[in-house]
């Protein structure tokens, strides 16, 4: 048997090593010129006006919610089928996460579900662009505008994703992730884009101790060595080591996503003859970033449960992932919201399985996964 095929592996090369070496030799390794270049590059990529690099997308979500003054007594609408960090940040600020159901086949939160969940206490809506495909963000943003509610796009899966001809994050506020498995990575990191100048200014303060400027800004412009604390803030800045890696990855984005698309197409063709159900694609015009390739493993239909399939793949030297276990089924949220029922979310949470998908995979690697799936389906 070949070596273990992981669910994901970052596509790192000599360019990333050279970028890190350049920063280490520059004498400026924390937040500095590479951060500024990364922020400018994302403004160019998305077409938005402001970009703020942070240490993680979770950090970005935290300070965005804070900047919007979300706290005790407020409600924030979000799908349950998302990474729990969003729910955690809402809860840690004293607000209430209002979890809504998703479309059964795309796993996208719908405008209808969002609007039905709005109350006088709703202060924000957080739609998720899921697995590399976009939610219907125009319709969701229209709801936010109609009710005067902020929309924060969870774009953690969305680098290289386009919706109706525009890159995700072209307007409004969106948060991207550079975590190790994302389409571009710098190990850990994130970035917020926004067209709200006041929000951008608050985010820059909140990410760096509540100061109006950072160390590089003082170094570059000769500002006073002791900056003024304007508001209590956090230490959520991104180092230039990480930013340099992200910049190098961004140059490769088209190539990386093209390879992801080729592997996804290979899976799609093979799955047409198998009982495992891939996600449906959104009906609106889009370019898929193929962050994840997810199948649904229904035991009655497939003759094997999701958990058994993942274990069988592991025995064959193939990794798989679960994106995600529904947040409202996790212990803390289950106890906090014991009567919450989200049928589509729960059905999928029990069946979804993410197959290996990363740019350095070969055609033979994908064939190996397909062969294993055929065997497990009894073919």
Swiss-Prot record:
Which BP terms does GO give this entry?
A: lipid A biosynthetic process; lipopolysaccharide biosynthetic process; response to antibiotic
| GO cellular component term, pick one | membrane
Reactions performed catalytically: UDP-4-amino-4-deoxy-beta-L-arabinose + 2-oxoglutarate = UDP-beta-L-threo-pentopyranos-4-ulose + L-glutamate
Q: Keywords in alphabetical order, please.
A: Aminotransferase, Antibiotic resistance, Lipid A biosynthesis, Lipid biosynthesis, Lipid metabolism, Lipopolysaccharide biosynthesis, Pyridoxal phosphate, Transferase
Q: Which SUPFAM superfamilies match?
A: PLP-dependent transferases (SSF53383)
State the Gene Ontology terms under molecular function: pyridoxal phosphate binding; UDP-4-amino-4-deoxy-L-arabinose aminotransferase
Q: Tell me which cofactor or cofactors this protein depends on.
A: pyridoxal 5'-phosphate
Q: Which InterPro entries match?
A: ArnB_NH2Trfase (IPR022850), DegT/StrS_aminotransferase (IPR000653), PyrdxlP-dep_Trfase (IPR015424), PyrdxlP-dep_Trfase_major (IPR015421), PyrdxlP-dep_Trfase_small (IPR015422)
In this UniProt entry, the residues modified to N6-(pyridoxal phosphate)lysine are 182
Q: Please give the superkingdom of this protein's source.
A: Bacteria
Enzyme class comes to transferase
Output the NCBIfam families linked to this UniProt entry.
PRK11658.1 (NF008658)
The record's HAMAP family line, in alphabetical order, gives: ArnB_transfer (MF_01167)
Q: How does it assemble?
A: Homodimer.
Which family does the UniProt entry place this protein in? Answer: Belongs to the DegT/DnrJ/EryC1 family. ArnB subfamily.
- Official protein name in the record: UDP-4-amino-4-deoxy-L-arabinose--oxoglutarate aminotransferase
Q: Which organism is it from?
A: Escherichia coli O81 (strain ED1a)
Lineage here is: Bacteria, Pseudomonadati, Pseudomonadota, Gammaproteobacteria, Enterobacterales
What gene codes for this chain? arnB
């Amino acid at each position: 048997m070949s070596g273990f095929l992981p669910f994901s592996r970052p596509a790192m090369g000599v360019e990333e090593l050279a970028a890190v070496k350049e920063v280490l030799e520059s004498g400026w390794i924390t937040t500095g010129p590479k951060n500024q270049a990364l922020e400018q590059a994302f403004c160019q990529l998305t077409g938005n006006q402001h970009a703020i690099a942070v240490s993680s997308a979770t950090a970005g979500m935290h300070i965005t919610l804070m900047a919007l003054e979300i706290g005790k007594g407020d409600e924030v609408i979000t799908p349950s089928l998302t990474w729990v960090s969003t729910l955690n940040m809402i809860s840690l600020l004293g607000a209430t996460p209002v979890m809504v159901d998703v479309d059964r086949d795309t796993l996208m939160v719908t405008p209808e579900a969002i609007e039905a969940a709005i109350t006088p206490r709703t202060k924000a809506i957080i739609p998720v662009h899921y697995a590399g495909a976009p939610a219907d963000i125009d319709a969701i943003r229209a709801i936010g505008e109609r009710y005067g509610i902020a929309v924060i796009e969870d774009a953690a899966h969305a680098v290289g994703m386009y919706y109706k001809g525009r890159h995700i994050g072209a307007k409004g506020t969106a948060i991207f992730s550079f975590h190790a498995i994302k389409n571009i990575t710098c190990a850990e990191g994130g970035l917020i884009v926004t067209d709200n100048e006041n929000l951008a200014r608050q985010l820059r303060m909140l990410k760096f101790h509540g100061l109006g400027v950072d160390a590089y800004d003082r170094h570059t412009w000769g500002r006073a060595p002791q900056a003024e604390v304007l508001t209590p803030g956090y230490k959520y800045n991104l180092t230039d080591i990480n930013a340099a890696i992200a910049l190098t990855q961004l140059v490769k984005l088209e190539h990386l996503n093209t390879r992801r698309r080729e592997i996804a197409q290979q899976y799609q063709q093979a799955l047409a003859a198998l009982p495992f159900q891939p996600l449906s694609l959104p009906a609106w015009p889009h370019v898929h970033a193929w962050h994840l390739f997810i199948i649904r493993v229904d035991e009655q239909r497939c003759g094997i449960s999701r958990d058994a399939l993942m274990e069988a793949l592991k025995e064959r030297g193939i990794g798989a992932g679960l994106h995600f276990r529904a947040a409202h089924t996790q212990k803390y949220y289950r106890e906090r919201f014991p009567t919450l029922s989200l049928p589509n979310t729960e059905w999928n949470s029990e069946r979804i399985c993410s197959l290996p998908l990363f740019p350095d995979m070969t055609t033979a690697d994908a064939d190996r996964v397909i062969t294993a799936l055929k065997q497990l389906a009894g073919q």
